[in-house]
Amino acid sequence: MVAALTYLPTELIQRIFEFTVVETDSQYWLYNLVALIDFSVSSRGGGSITEDFLTNYVRKNLMVLDLTCEATQDSILRAEYGFLKRLLPYIDMDAQYIRVVDLETNADKAQNLKAEKLIVIFDEFSDLKLIETFFPLANSNSNIIEFVFCVRNIKSSFYSPLEKLHIANIVADIDINTLYLDFVDSNIYSDQNFFGIFDPDIFQLINKNYRNFFSKTNEKGKKRPPICKKICFPFVETLNLDYMALDSFFNSILHKLTTKIKTFERNNEFDVDKNLNLNSTTTVAALIIKSILQQFFNNFHISFPNLVTLNFIKMSTYPNNNEITQCCNFIDLSSYVLNKCLSENISINFLFQLHSLKNWSMPKIKEFTGHKFKYDETTFSGSPERYIKSLRGNIKILQEMAINETNDGTCYFRVKLIPEGVEKTQIINWIPFTSSFSDDTFKQRHHLKRPMICLKNNSLRSLTVKIIRIEKCSSIRIQGFYLPNLQELFINNTLCDTTQHQKQASNDMSCIEFTSWNELPQCKKLGFAQLEDDSNYVLNISNLQDHLPNLDLRESFPTFFDIRQKFVVV
């Protein structure tokens, strides 16, 4: 939107400035302000527009309260933080910028402020209760408070600024528009805690009804702590996130949150008279968990307006250095997790929503390292027969959950695991249709003719898929990819590590087909991983033409010579 302003008349730009920032009900007003300032400076065409707007709005309506430690203040004043270095040059540092020392030594400076919007800057060492000192001194009309947390280093990802606001409880009974996390670098790293966002305690920080569920915390006359609606990482371009972060968060929900709720249920300590539909046939505990998770995905937002790359990483610590390996996001679909969801009445759709980053906004994202599904058996724990039996158990539970949880009773899940905007990624351990995974019942064989998961994405151009393959000389049908703009599909069909000890088959032939449960109209190239042990892929040309109508056979297969061929071997 900002880039398009270069083509508009001066008067219209002025009006856009006023509309996008002055609207105080918007959660985005502060980011909009900084983005417009950034545009005005970078375009070098603002001129009088910038001067008039900054004079008439910013310097009359904003004030900044800096509660950070001395080291952070020095970094702020040296313009090292990406968000603040764009905003503060247009703030009158003498009249609008208040530090802790000013609260103690220069009360007159605070008393003279009449601005209606307060921006509070804090870090790990800030005493947020100093805001209580500021308000009676200022006697201001401030009714909009924004918080900016300055992240000092990579270790700060263990720290939760939301929890700090919650504990301080200095602005009770209000909704914080947005908590901004500001960094020195646009390339950031995070552990599994993700600045407290992936902590089970996050729910009491973002859900105003959370306290009402538990009578001990719902004391009459006691104001609730502030509730945050949105967290914004304004100028982060690359996020390196621990590959277990999302999975660990879901596991903490399954264990810590459910344990707390069960404890209150046993002691009859719930206070849910107006918060839940008690006519439901499910338990009160299940309804509370459902309400809390729905609130998280529908009303709490994580914004990365400038994020281009999302990498999942694995960090290994050695005596002298840290080694960072890029990998895929870990999705646990083991029988243990699935059965835990069933026993706690937690919809598996919440797991898929979490791994789909449902409540994340990433309008500029292009790169995403991908996902890896995990089922029961590890690569070291069993024979091929045991692995197949384990997968059958996983598949059967997933099918039953899909039938019970989808609106139309289908035996598959429709998911958007790849963020829109991503053009290239990979998926490891995708389940195809193969007779190896079905038991002897007609019902499961019928269900397996449909995909377990239907993956939909409109932006993806290139996808690498590692298919789960147990047996040599097996026939596999690929399905579940609804990717209308995909141009390249690369398939890795190597045997799972648990089956490598099988007797080697000479000239192993694996037949690969595509089913009608795909949408790949633009796919031009089909590639395969380098094969070992004399393995080969056999593909039916007629099948490829039916389901990949735009496929370039000559480019995809060196063994293709003539359209009259019935098969190609890779």
Swiss-Prot record:
Keyword Phosphoprotein part of the UniProt annotation: yes
Per its UniProt entry, which superkingdom is the organism in?
Answer: Eukaryota
Q: Which UniProt keywords apply?
A: Phosphoprotein
Identify residues that carry Phosphoserine. Answer: 383
The identity of this protein, by name, is Protein BOP2
Tell me the classification of the organism that encodes this protein. Answer: Eukaryota, Fungi, Dikarya, Ascomycota, Saccharomycotina
